[in-house]
Curated annotation (Swiss-Prot):
Cellular component GO terms held in the UniProt record: axon; dendrite; membrane; neuronal cell body; plasma membrane
Key word Transmembrane helix present: yes
One Pfam family in the UniProt entry: 7tm_7
Membrane topology according to the record: Multi-pass membrane protein
Tissue-by-tissue expression: In larvae, is expressed in neurons of the dorsal pharyngeal sense organs.
Keywords attached to this entry: Cell membrane, Membrane, Receptor, Transducer, Transmembrane, Transmembrane helix
Protein name, entry field: Gustatory receptor for bitter taste 93a
Family listed: Belongs to the insect chemoreceptor superfamily. Gustatory receptor (GR) family. Gr93a subfamily.
UniProt KW Cell inner membrane keyword: no
Main location per the UniProt record: membrane
């Protein structure tokens, strides 16, 4: 009864997972983040046949979107920093929003140039999914936690999206046709950027789940090997039978080693291709937290009213960062599980073939030690969350210092320079 219930739960989670992934794929297609078509029979993404003319038009379209977005960033950020610069704190917020806009353009261009490589990595993930299903003899790989984390991340993304895009629908942004077109382009590019940023989180989550399934498969294999070493008369085997089983288990371990190697390489390829987007993901959410805190303090000082929306959005952006760090840390931890297993103890010195497979696999794990590093600067793990929190606290002290020294007060010098 329990196994039947677990099977139904696994099937339901797999159905939901496929539905959500298909929905994300269609959103990416609609936003032109992906131009590949999905072959459902082979479970692979195929590049659409494009002539040189279509490719030129695609590049031209990207350039137009980038130029329009770059020209519209004052309007896009006016809801946060205001339409006039009156204080030194306003200048600081302006510099922060400008840096986000510049990185958004860079992320957009890099993503457009690397679409073919991104498609290849996605196809390798899809091939690994099928290969792990065969090796582990499982029909459903995506557990309920995949659906939970996916929906949780989607909720935070939609909260931030509504908060950032709703101000663009003010009447002042639709006074003439040029502003209407510009607003539409800005929303289009921002949604495409958010889609790519969510893919960063999703890739690490999928890698972690695949690593977890492979680790569980090795644990189950070691459990099945226990009768080989058993001294109980009821389970004792002939030497020939032991050698036969150990050869089979050695072949199974070799296949696991091959999958671990491919999973290591595909995770690193994913990280390398999207490392600028991952950096932008971290920077965007961090700067948004800073801007929300700035907006909160500004309203508190000027209007004597507390804007709780700013605080809520700051926590939403922090949750985005925490989810990314947790998924990256989860992937690394799951990749190291086999090192903690007694592979070199179970059935050691009983068969040379098995001993060699274990030695090769453990050596491979030592060589292919997974580290999720962005641009060689920092590791994505749970410890990085503490670094982000300390940076936010430091920024709060800077804001407090600005307030004490009159940084939030209107300055004639600033007004004269930016009017």
């Amino acid at each position: 009864m329990f196994s039947s219930s677990s099977a139904m739960t696994g099937k339901r989670a797999e159905s939901w997972s496929r539905l959500l992934l298909l929905w994300l794929y269609r959103c990416a297609r609609g936003l032109l983040v992906l131009s590949s078509s999905l072959d459902r029979d082979k479970l692979q993404l195929k590049a659409t046949k494009q002539g040189s003319r279509n490719r030129f038009l695609h590049i031209l379209w990207r350039c137009i979107v980038v130029m329009i977005y770059a020209g519209l960033w004052p309007m896009l950020t006016s809801a946060v920093i205001g339409k006039r610069l009156e204080s030194y704190a306003d200048v600081l917020a302006l510099a922060q929003s400008m840096s986000v806009s510049i990185l958004a353009v860079i992320s957009f261009v890099i993503q457009a140039r690397g679409e073919n490589q991104f498609r290849e990595v996605l196809n390798r993930y899809l091939a690994l999914y099928q290969r792990i299903c065969l090796t582990t003899r499982l029909r459903h790989l995506f557990p309920t936690k995949f659906v939970v984390f996916f929906l949780l991340k989607l909720f935070f993304t939609l909260c931030g999206c509504f908060h950032e895009i709703i101000p663009l629908f003010e009447n002042s942004h639709f006074d003439d046709i040029s502003q209407m077109v510009g607003t539409g382009f800005g929303i289009y590019m921002w949604l495409g950027t958010l889609c790519v940023l969510d893919a960063c989180f999703l890739g690490f989550l999928v890698s972690g789940i695949l690593y977890e399934h492979m680790a569980n498969n090795i644990i189950a294999m070691l459990k099945r090997m226990e009768p080989i070493e058993s001294q109980d008369e009821r389970y004792r085997m002939t030497k020939y039978r032991r050698m036969q089983l150990l050869c089979d288990f050695a072949d199974e371990l070799d296949e696991c080693a091959a999958i671990y190697s491919e999973l290591y390489h595909v995770t690193n390829s994913f990280r390398r291709i999207l490392q600028w987007q991952i950096l932008f993901y971290i920077y965007l959410n961090f700067i948004n937290i800073c801007l929300m805190l700035y907006q909160y303090i500004l309203h508190f000082l000027n209007d004597d009213e507390v804007v709780f929306v700013s605080i809520v959005m700051a926590f939403v952006k922090l949750a985005n960062l925490v989810l990314l760090m947790m998924c990256a840390d989860y992937t690394v931890r799951q990749s190291e599980v086999p090192k903690k297993l007694p592979l070199d103890i179970v059935c050691s010195d009983m068969d040379e073939r098995w001993d060699k497979s274990v030695e090769t696999f453990l050596g491979q794990l030592q060589t292919q030690r997974l580290e999720i590093k962005v641009l060689g600067f920092f590791h994505l793990n749970n410890e990085f969350i503490l670094l982000i929190l300390s940076a936010i606290i430091s920024y709060l002290f800077i804001l407090i210092q600005f307030g004490i020294t009159g940084g939030f007060e209107a300055s004639e010098d600033i007004k004269n320079r930016f009017d």
